[in-house]
Structure formats: structure tokens, C-alpha cells
């Protein structure tokens, strides 16, 4: 056929022309030119209209725009010239030539207009133009080649060549980013947003990140900012709106709503996933075509077809690389959005919970563990349906090769799928049990870490350590059932891919043999089928794991939905506004004064609120109301009628457990109103909880919080709350960090910082729930006078102040008093004088009304006569040192790994279990890989004599499959069931031991959330993610080595490239890991403050809602979540870059092998070529898996690194000399000698200075002093919680510096200021943590502290302690009851009666006299009357020095001029008598 006739036919192949390796001209013009041009002409108007209507000008005019215009004009000129050439050509024009040329001219004009609009109105390169120009260049190049080969119309060929070159230049120009030309407001957009389609395909937008990460330490601020659709506020609004409209009737409503709100990003994943499937199943056809071509006679003149095969392999593998990267990256984008939505919703819901329903641990588990499972499940969700499609296609193609034998893998697949679906339900149930066990352990651990001073003082370290370790062992035991199910699931997943080829080849061979030998298993059929089995294996295994992972995420969705459907707190109050604005700043404080910078969060709070005056002149009015925490139970308080007058001081008093705190929470709307009503003049008030609530931050941040910053007002508040002198002792003053829950602060300081926050907020109403209990009398007088005296700042502001107090000495100064009687029914109210006239709690208080009490302020001098001892400054200094150390350590180690970490991991497991695992994996991989060689031998034997020794070849093949399953189960069992409990127990024990042995300065300097992360997130990684990563990484590593060997066997010259391949892989991995490790560290670090804020919010719900800070905290949460999303998203994004690069490397290997096949035709056996090509397909998959598993392992091994650093870097409080074991009866008497004792935190300044004191057996000793004088330090020294720098302490003849510290703490009895009870545990366990006491003994102790009736009313000793709903004072009484049960002759009370009223204080003193009559008692006292009446000796401390010592009556007799104790007593007595 001549060329002219050939090109006028449709073709598509030009048979007989140009070597048969070309398309016809008609086909090229009608299929390659016209359609793509028509698509441009259709798309361009819509795109241009959209940009002009929806977008503003984004790019400044520049030379680059003019370059694009010039290129467009050149293209138009070349297209016109091309049309002219066609019209002048007498030959070889087709019926499509002129229409195609004319359309191209129109397209050139369209390109000119669209290029201008895209350049000016879009901040990214045009996707429409880039795609059109890309395909147009490829298709035009094909047509240009045809024209050159024709040779009939050289001018047309030249103009076509010029047009193609111009399009290449246009494509280059349109591809370049416009960031340098963007207007200033758009230049900070994320790199991904401003990148073009090719940058997205090949992830080149990440290269700046790799450059910085390779050579520098990355910071979150240096990462790409989030684009709009990832912003948590946007995502929350999106989900919240849809969730509000959802019916919420089914278990999966939340899942459906999330899908509805993110429908577009989720559905966009489908197209690249389908393209990936298409490219994947091109591979068997390429193998078949390559083997057929290789088996032909080497003299055949068809080398062009060989070149075509090279091009086909290249295009298919490039297509696989791009589509893999795109569908995985789009999946990560959708997953990131889901994460942002759910975490935002969880926080929003948590901030709406009632205070009784708020469980920090349960909520945090949802935010951490469940969100992680959803993340994992959603990243594989699209694989579930895609794997089914892949299975169907693979089976169909197998049917074309093996006939009915293809039904074997179908049956195997159905068996695997059905078995997996059945197993998934059991997996979910076991997983839920495991998560609950984790939650229980973390709850107890978190509580212990938050109260370490109480734990150590009570001698509970060993008891709690044993209990928590037992919970850990129980947790691992429960998880064992889950792990065994995972192995069963894995066996189901691998049975089909391993045995399907065996059974299929056997069935095919037997059928072919029975049919007379038709369809012999030759090389082509064997290896084409084997490639299909390889492609079938991946979706079969992936389907099972993806389905399991997705169903696990569905279970987490159900758990989160249940949480979101939890009843929110209901504010039953009636809020009445009068339209006035709240009072302004105090007089003399000008808004023009110098202020500290205002954060965006603080700006959101700079608004006025309605006044505190209701229409009837009262701040609150309670009318016949009943309050309770559970509407289905008896009210805690009932029939309450009371008023809170506006602008007055109201005191709420009553016995311990009478419901004072409940009444305050009712005023805040935190407790349900079962009947009656509460009228409030304002929805927000300043509130100080009985247990001070603090967020982790500086003193300044804690006080100012979200109020308007004003420096003069701030300084005035510090002075009023007697904090200035405390701040001078902190290393950074008010910029010192106070730690989690204010751990760095002493009890009194914590209460005063909380009080300062309430005063600073300048709310019209302040509620103070027993905030003076932790202050010494002198400091209390000063603070009370400064705030509530006749000229106190709260009086000047006309603030409504409600004070709950267990001390009645302030009653005469109250304008109004509400008195609860302890029965829970009714109350009395009125002025002090009025209440004194009737029979009630006030009249029984024996407090008289001095003249002018309410008009005259209690007199007091400064809060302290000398600077307080810096008891917490050492902790703050330790914190500073730790921050610097961690910073240096992180900077040095983030970008690189450490082989020592892997050694540390293996040591925790044991070398023998590790070697068993390694040998089992190697055996498994051998049995997996060798069958390829075996099949080559079988095919070669079949070629010589069909069906020869069929049983022999099938039997060995089946045996190898069975052995691979056996070794797979053995290796997986060894890792998941045997090695995980070993490492899990060892690491937890190391962490727990480190924490229990850590000094108190560690807990002051280290955020509790960071330590909890070691016990939760890191151990979770070690329990599941790390072992699976290690298993997958090592197995895939050995498999890749085996496949490289097989590729080299099949195409031995390829082995020459392997060293270069390995070097390239090392460079890529090295470059990648230096960035990915940092991103992983940043991901974990960014989660810690997010989790910390979540926990702080849940524990401080009453406070933050009272202040009206919910919105401000939610804004802060959005900022932290957005900060967390950046490394989270980019970590997965850089993994996609790595996947793409690896795919490119595999593409090079595949092309190299095919090039060798074509160039060495006839020299390579077809069977070995098949071995090489099949293994290339598998190597492509496994190399990506290896690098993914390896990088995942490298990030997961960070958990081991952090634990290793934590255990090695955390100092132990124990000293080498502390080895002496005291006699079992020690101490037997109770004598204590302080001999010139100086003590402090490690190398810090002494907080006790040269203390000498002798306490005889049975003496009752009271320790007095101003706040910060060293009282708690003296107790801490006795319990060895601070270190001796000089001197010694002798207890019953033994120097305690030689005795193990925990031994001392278990031999002495300590009652801490903050009562420590183990929530979630029974009353019996809390009363008798060590066990061994009878129920009668426990009952006797609880009766003594008047708590037995509460215990019996709630179910007895086996009732959980939190079900008793003990008040703060009752919790202290419980601890005293626990002290009664311990027989030690030494009892130490650290302000144990700070939160009880006078009656209970008298009860405690009576118990000291009666139950501790033969014991030595050391008590820190603030109530000096108690020291006068109940103690044999008083020790007065000042600035860490022993000021004086003696019998209280003797010291008092010396008079205030000669005695510090007498001076302190007189300063209190001159105002008001103490309680009796």
C-alpha cells in the first residue's frame, strides 16, 4: 500500500507504511488533534467566566505575562502558516486535515485569552492550559513525525515542528509558579496551593521543605501554612451545621454526616484510584507481549515493536507512579479534614458537658486513640471497594489464561473475605475491651502523676506502682486475645494468595492432561498467570486488612458519636439583664497606660458585660429550689430560699459536707435545678473553685488569662493578693511557668493566683469557694483587708462577693450570711446580728460582733515580715534547665536516627526471641520466593515433554506454600504474641520505676501531659504500631533482597545496576528521613499541648464557663489544632513524595530490563525473562512497601527513643548510701531529731537553713509561720522529698539519710494538704491500700471521722470512692481515717484541716488527742488557737530558719515584743477570736 492511500484510511496503524510502526494521518488528525482541541474550546469559556466572576486580580503585571502573550502570538502565526501549507499541498491531505488546522487556529486565539485571564486572576498555574499543552505536544509530535516520514509536504512538516516547539515553550512558561509575581496578600499562601498540576503530580512543591529539613532544624512556624479547607474553624462549622440537622437515630449517623460534608474530597479519590487499577492490569499484558516477542525468531525484522515495548513499559510505570501518588495524597487530604472535624467537635462537646459527666481520661482516649484509628481506617477506606474490583479483574484475566481453574482463586477469595468479615466483628469487640483496659490504666496513672506529693507523703508509691503494673499486665493479657485474632485474620488473608496459584496450576494441568494435552503450561502462560496471581495477592491481602482497619474506624466513629450524644450541661438559671454595662477599670488606671501585647484570644474577650444588678437589686435570687448532680437521685440540697444582694459581701457557711460548694455550682448553673428557680443577674461571674484550677503557663498568663491586659491594674491585683514577694523569688518572676495544675506553686500561692485571676477579671460578681483555707492567718488577714476591707478594691468596685468559708471568724464582716445546717434541707439567711439571735450554725460559732466590724477593716501589715522561702523557685529553675537540655537534645537528634535505639528495643525483648523471629521470617521469605524458580524449571520441563513428572512439580510447589504459611504464622506469633508482652511489660516497668523514683523537682518542672504521653501514646505505639512496623519492615526487606536476586537471575546484566540502585535508595532515604523524622517529632509535640488543653478544659469546666471563656478557649483550641494539623498533614505528604521517587526508580529498573531483553534477544531464556518481569512487578510493590514500612518504623521507633531518653535522663531521688534496711518495728517510739539540717532541691538554694530540733516520743508539735516560711519544706524533708544539704535527721536512733526513701514513707504516716484518693477504686482499697485489715477496723476508722454513714448509704466498702461524692473537707477526713488505720508512732499532718469548719477541726483535734495519743504528731497549723490548745510544742519558722521553739503557752506569755508566735497570735486575736 502506498503512503498516500495508507494515510487516508483510518487505520489506526499504517500497515505497510513507514515500517508499520506509525499511525495513519487521518487517525492522528481525527483522534489525536480534533478531540483535544474541541475540549479546550468547550472548557475555556467556563473557566474564564468563573475566574472573572469569582476572583479578583491576584498577580501583578510583569514581563512574564508579556512573554506568554508573545508565545501565544507565535503559536497563532505558526498555525496560520500550517493551514496555508495544507491548502497549497496537492497531495496527502485527508478529509480531517483542513478542519483540524482551522480548529487549531481557533484554539490558538482561545489560548491567548485564557492564558491572560489565568495569569492575572489565578494564583496557580492553569490546569486547563497545562493539560491541553501537554497532550497537544505529545500528539503534535506524533503527527510531526508522520509528516517528516512522509516527505511529501516539507513546508507543512517544518511549520508543524515549529508549532510543536512553540507549544513546548508555552508549556514551560505556563508550568512556572507565579509566587514571585503575586500580590503581597497572596504571597504567604501554602506552596501546594500556588503549585501547578505537574508539581502536584510529582510533588515538587515539597522540595523547599526537604531543603530546609536536610540542613536545619524544622520548626512548626517554618512549615507551609494550612490552606483554608484545613482550618479547624471552617471544618467544625461544616460538620456542626450538618450534625445539628441529622436525625441521630442510628449508630452510624456521624459517619454518614462526615461523608456528606466532605463528599467532594472523598469522591475525588475515585478517579485516580481507577486509573491506578487500569495501569496495574496493563502489566500482565506487557509481560505476555514481551515474552511472545522474545520467543520469536531473532532474525525477525520487528525491532520497532521492541522499542514500542520499551515505551509501553515506561508509560505504564510512570502512570502507576503518578496515580499512586495522587490517590494516596487525596486520601490524606480527606483524612486530615476528617481529623480536623472530629477533634473540633470533641472539644466543643467536652466544653459543654456537665461537671459530673466530664471524664478527662475517657474524652482524651477518644481524641487520641480513636482519632488515630479513624486516621488509619480512612487512609485505606477506598482500598476496600478498589480491591474488590481488582480481584474481579484479576480473576477474569486468569480465566482467559487458565480457563475453569480461575474459579480456584475465586473460591479462595470468597473464603478469605467471608472469614475476615466474620472475624472483624470479634476483632472490634476485643479491641473495645483492650481500649477500656488502656483507659483504666491511664486514668489511675494520670491521677497519680497529678498528685505525686500526696502519693509520696502517704507512702503509696509502691502500692500504686504494683497496682498500675498489674493493670498493665491485665491490659496486655486482654490485648492478647485481640492479637491472636489479628494473626487469624492474617492467615485468612494469605491463604488465598499462597495456595490459589498451587491449586489453580494443579487444576489446569489435570484438566489439560485429561483433554489430551491441549493448553500446556508453557512459559508465556505460566508467567502471565503468575503475574496475575501477584496482582491478585495484593488486593486480597489488602482487602482483609483494609476492611478490618476501616471497620475499626467505624467502631471509633460509634464511640465518638455516643460521646457527642451525651447530655450536655443544662443551665436552668433565669438570667435577667437590666441593660447597663459593667463598671469600668478602677479609677486612676488609664487605658492609655503601657500594656503588654494583646493576643488574638485576649482581644476576643475585650468586651463589656451587663451589670450585676437584677431588677430587684439582688445578684441572685433562689426560690424554693432543690439541687442535685443527678436528676434521678435525691437532691443534694432541697427547699433552698436565699438571696445574694448586689454589691455586698455574702458569706456561705455550714458544716463539712453541708452542700456549700453544691450551692455555689447551682449559682453558676453547673448543678441541675430539680424544683424552684434561680434568678441570676448575669451569665458570667469570676469564680475560684475550692481546688484551684490552672492552665499550664506562666503566672502572668494564669492571672490575666483572657481578660483585657492592663499593667497598672495587674500590679494592683498582685499587691492586693500578696503575690509580689512570692514572684520576686521565682527565677523569671511572673513569667515563670507554674506547671500542670499549678504544681510549681505551694497550696497558698495556688489559691492566691486563682484569687488574683478572679479579681483581675473585674466581673460584677465573684464567687470564692474556700479560697483562704490554705493561707496562714497573717496572709489571710492581709488579703482579706486588701480585697474586702472597708477600702478593699472589691468594695471600691461595688462587686458582689460570695465567699464560702469553713472559718467563721469573718462572719461579722459579712453584709449577708447564708447558713446551711448540714441536713441538706433549707437554709437560714440574714445579717450576722440577726442570725445570732436564733438557733443555727452561726449562733453556735461563738463569734462575737466587734463594734464596727463591717465598717472597719481588719488591720494587718504586709503579708510577710521577711521574704518567703523560694520553695518553688528550685523547681522553676529545674524547668528552665530541662527546657534548654531538651532543646539541645532535640536539635542534635531529630534529623538522624540511632542504631543504639534498635539495640535497646531488642534488649527489652531478649535476643533469643529476636533470633527465632529473624530465622522464621527468612524461612518464610524463602518459601515465598523460591517457587518462581521452581515454576521456571517446571515450564522448561513442560517445553521438552508436556506434563512430565506433574505430581513431583505440583507436590514440591504445594509443600513450599504450606511451609510459607507455617513460617508466617510462627514469625507473626513470635512478634505479636510473644515479643510484644515482653517489651510492653519491660518498657512500662521502666517508665513507672523512673516516675516513682523521680524527685519532686521533676514533677514541678515537667508538664504532666508530656509524661502521660509516655504512658499512653508511646506505649500504644510499642504495643501495636511498632511491632507491626518491625514485622512488615524486616519481612519486606528480606523479600526485596530475594526479588533483586531473582531479577538478576532473569536478566543478569541488571545486577550491574544494583549498586547504583542501592546507593540511590540510600540517598533518597537519607534525604527523606532527615525531614520526616522531624515532622514526626513535631507531630507528636504538637499533639501534647492539644491534649493538655483538652484535659485542662474538662477538669476546669465550671471555672471557664463561669468566666465566660468558652469561646476564647475554643479559639485557642482551633489555633492548637491548626498547629497540629500542619506536621500531621505534611508527614503523610512527604511519604507520598517518597513513594513517587521509589516508583520512578522501579520504572528505571523495569525499562532497563526490557532494554536488555530487546538488545540481547535470543541470548536470554524466556523463562528467566519471565522470572525477572514477574519479580519487577512484585519488586515495585514491595519496594514501596519497604520504604513505607521503614519510614513508619523510623517514626514509631521514636517512642523507644523517647522512653530511653526519659528513663536515662530523668534523675532518681535515691542516693547510693540509702541502703540500710531498718528493723521491722522501726520506728517504735517516735523520737525525731533535726540536727543542723539544711535542705533544698539538689543544687538549688537551701529552703531550710540550719534547723535543730528535738521531738520526744508522743509529743504533739505544731509548725507555724507565714506563707512560704518553710513549713511544707520541713515536712518534705522528713519524708525525704527534698534533699539534705547539711546536717542529719535521726528517727528513733537511725539517720534517715541511710534508709531507702520509700521505706521511710511507708513507716511514717503522712496526711497531705491535698487529699489523695484513688478514683475508680473501692472505699476499702482507699482506706487500706496495702491490704490486710479487717472490715471492722476500717468501719471503726470511718466512724471516727464520721464518714461511715455515707459509705453505708452508697453500698458499703466495695463501692467506688467517687460514688460517695465526698466534698473537699470530707476527702481530708477520709485521709485522716486512713492515717488512723496505720500503726506508725509518727503522724505528720500537712495542713490536713485547711478545708474544714471549726466543728470538724475540733473533731480532728479530738482524734489527735484520742487516736494519736501515744503517737508523735507533727502538724502544720494556720489556726493558731489550735496550736495553743492542742500542742505540746510550737515551732515557728521564718525564711527557712528556726525563729523560735517552745510550749505555746510559754511563748504566748513572753508577749508580742519578745515572741514571734505571740506576735502572730496577737495580730489575729486583735481582729477576732479564733474558732473554738
From Swiss-Prot:
Domain (ABC transmembrane type-1): residue spans on this chain: 274-552, 916-1195
Membrane topology listed for this record: Multi-pass membrane protein
GO CC annotations on file: plasma membrane
Pfam family, one: TMD0_ABC
Span of domain ABC transporter: 622-847, 1232-1464
Transmembrane domains' residue ranges: 23-43, 64-84, 97-117, 156-176, 266-286, 305-325, 384-404, 407-427, 485-505, 532-552, 906-926, 950-970, 1021-1041, 1045-1065, 1137-1157, 1167-1187
Residue segments, region Disordered: 586-615, 842-870
Function: ABC-type transporter; part of the gene cluster that mediates the biosynthesis of the fusahexin, a cyclic hydrophobic hexapeptide with the amino acid sequence cyclo-(D-Ala-L-Leu-D-allo-Thr-L-Pro-D-Leu-L-Leu) that plays an important role in cell surface hydrophobicity.
Glycosylation sites (chain numbering): 2, 624, 682, 696, 798, 836, 1250, 1414
Listed Low complexity bias regions: 855-870
Residues that bind ATP: 654-661, 1265-1272
MF annotations from Gene Ontology: ABC-type transporter activity; ATP binding; ATP hydrolysis activity
Localization per record: Cell membrane
UniProt KW keywords: ATP-binding, Cell membrane, Glycoprotein, Membrane, Nucleotide-binding, Transmembrane, Transmembrane helix, Transport
Name by which UniProt lists this protein: ABC-type transporter FG02316
Principal location class: membrane
Family under the similarity heading: Belongs to the ABC transporter superfamily. ABCC family. Conjugate transporter (TC 3.A.1.208) subfamily.
InterPro entries in the record: AAA+_ATPase (IPR003593), ABC1_TM_dom (IPR011527), ABC1_TM_sf (IPR036640), ABC_transporter-like_ATP-bd (IPR003439), ABC_transporter-like_CS (IPR017871), ABC_transporter_C-like (IPR050173), ABCC_6TM_D1 (IPR044746), ABCC_6TM_D2 (IPR044726)
Taxonomic classification: Eukaryota, Fungi, Dikarya, Ascomycota, Pezizomycotina
Amino acid at each position: 500500500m502506498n503512503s498516500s492511500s495508507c494515510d487516508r484510511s483510518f487505520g489506526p496503524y499504517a500497515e505497510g507504511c513507514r515500517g508499520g510502526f506509525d499511525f495513519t494521518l487521518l487517525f492522528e488528525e481525527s483522534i489525536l488533534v480534533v478531540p483535544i482541541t474541541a475540549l479546550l474550546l468547550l472548557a475555556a469559556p467556563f473557566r474564564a467566566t468563573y475566574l472573572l466572576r469569582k476572583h479578583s486580580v491576584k498577580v501583578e503585571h510583569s514581563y512574564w505575562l508579556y512573554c506568554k502573550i508573545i508565545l501565544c502570538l507565535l503559536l497563532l502565526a505558526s498555525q496560520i502558516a500550517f493551514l496555508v501549507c495544507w491548502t497549497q499541498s496537492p497531495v496527502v491531505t485527508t478529509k480531517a486535515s483542513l478542519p483540524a488546522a482551522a480548529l487549531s487556529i481557533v484554539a490558538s486565539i482561545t489560548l491567548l485569552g485564557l492564558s491572560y485571564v489565568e495569569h492575572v486572576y489565578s494564583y496557580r498555574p492553569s490546569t486547563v492550559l497545562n493539560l491541553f499543552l501537554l497532550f497537544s505536544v505529545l500528539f503534535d509530535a506524533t503527527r510531526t513525525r508522520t509528516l517528516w516520514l512522509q516527505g511529501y509536504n516539507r513546508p507543512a512538516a517544518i511549520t508543524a515542528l515549529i508549532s510543536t516547539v512553540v507549544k513546548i515553550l508555552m508549556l514551560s512558561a505556563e508550568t512556572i509558579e507565579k509566587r514571585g509575581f503575586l500580590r503581597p496578600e497572596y504571597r504567604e499562601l501554602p506552596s501546594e496551593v500556588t503549585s501547578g498540576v505537574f508539581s502536584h503530580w510529582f510533588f515538587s512543591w515539597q522540595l523547599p521543605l526537604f531543603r530546609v529539613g536536610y540542613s536545619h532544624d524544622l520548626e512548626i512556624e517554618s512549615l507551609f501554612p494550612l490552606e483554608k479547607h484545613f482550618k479547624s474553624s471552617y471544618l467544625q462549622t461544616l460538620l456542626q451545621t450538618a450534625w445539628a440537622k441529622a436525625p441521630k437515630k442510628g449508630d452510624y449517623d456521624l459517619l454518614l454526616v462526615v461523608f456528606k460534608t466532605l463528599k467532594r474530597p472523598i469522591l475525588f479519590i475515585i478517579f485516580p484510584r481507577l486509573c491506578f487499577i487500569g495501569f496495574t492490569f496493563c502489566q500482565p499484558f506487557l509481560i505476555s507481549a514481551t515474552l511472545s516477542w522474545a520467543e520469536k525468531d531473532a532474525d525477525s525484522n520487528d525491532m520497532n515493536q521492541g522499542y514500542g515495548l520499551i515505551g509501553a513499559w515506561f508509560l505504564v510505570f510512570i502512570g502507576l507512579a503518578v496515580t499512586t501518588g495522587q490517590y494516596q495524597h487525596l486520601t490524606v487530604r480527606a483524612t486530615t479534614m476528617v481529623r480536623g472535624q472530629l477533634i473540633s467537635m470533641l472539644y466543643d462537646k467536652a466544653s459543654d458537658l456537665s461537671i459530673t459527666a466530664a471524664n478527662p481520661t475517657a474524652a482524651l482516649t477518644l481524641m487520641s486513640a480513636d482519632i488515630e484509628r479513624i486516621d488509619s481506617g480512612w487512609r485505606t477506606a477506598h482500598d476496600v471497594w478498589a480491591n474488590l474490583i481488582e480481584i474481579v479483574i484479576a480473576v477474569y484475566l486468569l480465566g482467559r489464561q487458565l480457563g475453569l481453574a480461575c474459579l480456584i482463586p475465586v473460591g479462595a477469595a470468597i473464603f478469605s473475605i467471608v472469614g475476615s468479615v466474620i472475624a472483624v466483628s470479634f476483632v472490634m469487640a476485643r479491641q473495645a475491651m483492650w481500649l477500656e483496659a488502656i483507659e483504666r490504666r491511664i486514668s489511675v496513672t494520670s491521677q497519680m502523676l497529678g498528685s505525686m506529693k500526696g502519693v509520696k507523703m502517704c507512702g503509696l508509691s509502691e502500692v500504686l506502682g504494683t497496682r498500675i503494673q498489674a493493670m498493665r499486665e491485665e491490659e496486655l493479657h486482654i490485648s492478647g486475645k485481640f492479637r491472636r485474632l489479628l494473626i487469624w485474620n492474617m492467615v485468612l488473608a494469605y491463604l488465598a494468595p499462597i495456595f490459589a496459584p498451587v491449586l489453580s496450576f494443579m487444576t489446569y494441568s489435570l484438566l489439560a492432561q485429561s483433554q489430551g494435552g491441549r493448553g500446556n503450561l508453557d512459559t508465556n502462560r505460566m508467567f502471565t498467570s503468575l503475574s496475575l496471581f501477584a496482582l491478585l495477592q495484593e488486593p486480597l491481602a489488602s482487602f482483609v486488612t483494609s476492611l478490618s482497619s476501616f471497620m475499626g474506624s467505624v467502631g471509633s466513629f460509634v464511640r465518638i458519636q455516643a460521646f457527642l450524644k451525651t447530655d450536655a450541661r443544662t443551665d436552668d438559671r433565669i438570667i435577667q439583664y437590666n441593660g447597663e454595662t459593667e463598671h469600668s477599670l478602677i479609677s486612676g488606671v488609664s487605658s492609655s497606660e503601657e500594656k503588654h501585647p494583646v493576643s488574638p484570644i485576649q482581644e476576643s474577650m475585650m468586651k463589656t458585660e451587663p451589670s450585676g444588678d437584677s431588677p430587684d437589686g439582688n445578684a441572685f435570687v433562689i426560690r424554693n429550689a432543690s439541687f442535685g448532680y443527678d436528676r434521678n437521685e435525691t437532691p443534694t440540697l432541697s427547699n433552698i430560699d436565699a438571696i445574694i444582694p448586689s454589691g455586698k459581701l455574702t458569706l456561705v457557711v455550714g458544716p463539712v459536707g453541708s452542700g456549700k460548694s453544691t450551692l455555689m455550682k447551682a449559682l453558676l448553673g453547673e448543678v441541675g435545678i430539680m424544683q424552684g428557680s434561680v434568678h441570676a443577674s448575669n451569665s458570667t461571674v469570676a469564680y475560684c473553685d475550692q481546688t484551684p484550677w490552672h492552665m499550664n503557663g506562666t503566672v502572668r498568663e494564669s492571672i490575666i488569662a483572657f481578660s483585657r491586659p492592663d499593667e497598672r491594674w495587674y500590679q494592683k491585683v498582685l499587691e492586693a493578693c500578696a503575690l509580689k514577694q512570692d514572684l520576686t523569688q521565682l527565677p523569671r518572676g511572673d513569667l515563670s511557668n507554674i506547671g500542670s495544675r499549678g504544681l510549681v506553686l505551694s497550696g497558698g500561692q495556688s489559691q492566691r493566683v486563682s484569687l488574683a485571676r478572679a479579681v483581675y477579671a473585674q466581673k460584677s460578681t465573684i464567687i470564692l469557694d474556700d479560697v483562704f483555707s490554705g493561707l496562714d492567718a497573717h496572709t489571710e488577714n492581709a488579703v482579706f483587708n486588701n480585697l474586702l476591707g472597708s477600702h478593699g478594691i472589691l468594695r471600691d468596685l461595688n462587686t458582689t462577693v460570695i465567699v464560702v468559708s469553713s472559718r467563721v471568724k469573718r462572719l461579722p464582716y459579712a453584709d449577708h450570711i447564708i447558713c446551711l445546717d448540714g441536713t441538706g434541707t433549707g437554709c437560714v439567711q440574714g445579717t450576722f446580728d440577726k442570725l445570732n439571735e436564733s438557733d443555727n450554725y452561726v449562733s453556735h460559732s461563738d463569734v462575737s460582733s466587734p463594734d464596727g466590724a463591717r465598717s472597719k477593716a481588719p488591720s494587718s501589715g504586709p503579708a510577710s515580715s521577711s521574704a518567703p522561702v523560694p520553695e518553688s523557685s528550685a523547681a522553676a529553675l529545674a524547668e528552665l534547665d530541662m527546657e534548654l537540655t531538651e532543646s539541645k537534645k532535640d536539635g542534635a537528634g531529630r534529623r538522624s536516627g540511632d542504631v543504639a535505639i534498635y539495640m535497646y528495643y531488642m534488649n527489652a525483648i531478649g535476643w533469643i526471641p529476636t533470633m527465632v523471629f529473624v530465622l522464621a521470617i527468612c524461612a518464610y521469605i524463602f518459601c515465598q520466593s523460591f517457587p518462581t524458580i521452581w515454576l521456571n524449571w517446571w515450564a522448561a520441563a513442560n517445553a521438552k515433554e508436556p506434563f512430565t513428572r506433574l505430581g513431583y512439580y505440583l507436590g514440591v510447589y504445594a509443600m513450599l506454600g504450606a511451609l510459607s504459611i507455617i513460617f508466617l504464622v510462627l514469625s507473626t506469633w513470635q512478634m505479636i504474641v510473644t515479643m510484644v508482652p515482653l517489651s510492653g511489660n519491660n518498657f512500662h516497668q521502666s517508665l513507672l520505676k523512673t516516675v516513682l523514683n523521680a524527685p519532686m523537682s521533676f514533677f514541678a518542672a515537667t508538664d504532666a501531659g508530656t509524661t502521660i504521653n509516655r504512658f499512653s501514646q508511646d506505649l500504644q505505639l510499642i504495643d501495636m504500631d511498632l511491632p507491626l512496623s518491625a514485622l512488615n519492615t524486616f519481612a519486606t526487606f528480606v523479600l526485596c533482597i530475594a526479588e533483586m536476586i531473582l531479577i538478576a537471575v532473569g536478566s543478569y546484566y541488571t545486577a550491574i545496576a544494583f549498586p547504583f540502585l542501592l546507593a540511590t535508595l540510600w540517598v533518597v532515604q537519607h534525604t527523606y528521613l532527615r525531614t520526616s523524622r522531624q515532622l514526626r517529632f513535631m507531630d507528636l509535640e504538637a499533639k501534647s499541648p492539644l491534649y493538655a488543653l483538652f484535659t485542662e478544659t474538662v477538669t476546669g469546666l465550671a471555672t471557664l464557663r463561669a468566666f465566660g471563656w468558652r469561646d476564647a478557649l475554643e479559639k485557642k483550641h482551633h489555633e492548637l489544632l491548626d498547629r497540629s494539623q500542619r506536621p500531621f498533614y505534611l508527614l503523610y505528604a512527604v511519604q507520598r513524595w517518597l513513594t513517587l521517587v521509589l516508583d520512578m526508580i522501579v520504572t528505571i529498573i523495569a525499562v532497563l530490563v526490557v532494554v536488555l531483553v530487546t538488545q540481547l534477544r535470543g541470548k536470554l531464556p524466556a523463562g528467566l525473562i519471565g522470572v525477572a518481569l514477574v519479580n519487577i512487578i512484585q519488586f515495585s510493590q514491595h519496594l514501596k512497601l519497604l520504604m513505607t514500612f521503614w519510614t513508619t518504623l523510623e517514626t514509631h521507633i521514636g517512642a523507644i527513643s523517647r522512653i530511653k531518653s526519659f528513663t536515662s535522663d530523668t534523675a532518681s531521688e535515691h542516693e547510693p548510701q540509702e541502703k540500710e534496711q531498718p528493723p521491722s518495728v522501726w520506728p517504735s517510739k517516735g523520737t525525731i531529731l533535726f540536727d543542723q539540717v539544711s535542705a533544698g532541691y539538689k543544687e538549688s538554694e537551701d529552703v531550710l537553713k540550719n534547723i535543730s530540733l528535738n521531738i520526744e516520743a508522743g509529743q504533739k508539735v505544731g509548725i507555724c509561720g507565714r506563707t512560704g516560711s518553710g513549713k511544707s519544706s520541713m515536712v518534705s524533708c522528713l519524708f525525704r522529698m527534698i534533699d539534705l544539704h547539711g546536717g542529719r535527721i535521726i528517727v528513733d536512733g537511725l539517720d534517715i539519710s541511710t534508709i531507702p526513701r520509700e521505706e521511710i514513707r511507708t513507716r511514717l504516716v503522712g496526711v497531705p494538704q491535698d487529699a489523695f484518693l484513688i478514683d475508680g477504686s473501692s472505699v476499702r482499697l482507699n482506706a487500706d491500700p496495702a491490704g490486710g485489715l479487717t472490715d471492722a477496723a476500717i468501719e471503726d476508722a470511718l466512724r471516727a471521722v464520721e464518714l461511715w454513714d455515707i459509705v453505708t448509704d452508697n453500698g458499703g466498702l466495695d463501692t467506688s470512692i467517687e460514688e460517695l461524692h465526698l466534698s473537699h473537707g470530707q476527702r481530708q477526713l477520709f485521709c485522716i481515717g486512713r492515717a488512723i488505720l496505720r500503726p506508725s508512732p509518727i503522724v505528720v499532718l500537712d495542713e490536713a484541716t485547711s478545708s474544714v469548719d471549726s466543728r470538724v477541726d475540733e473533731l480532728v483535734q479530738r482524734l489527735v488527742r484520742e487516736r494519736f495519743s501515744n503517737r508523735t504528731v507533727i502538724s502544720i497549723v494556720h489556726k493558731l488557737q489550735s496550736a495553743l490548745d492542742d500542742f505540746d510544742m510550737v515551732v515557728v519558722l521564718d525564711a527557712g530558719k528556726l525563729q523560735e521553739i517552745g510550749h505555746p503557752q510559754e511563748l504566748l506569755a513572753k508577749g508580742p515584743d519578745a515572741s514571734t508566735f505571740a506576735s502572730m497570735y496577737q495580730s489575729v486575736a486583735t481582729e477576732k477570736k479564733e474558732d473554738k
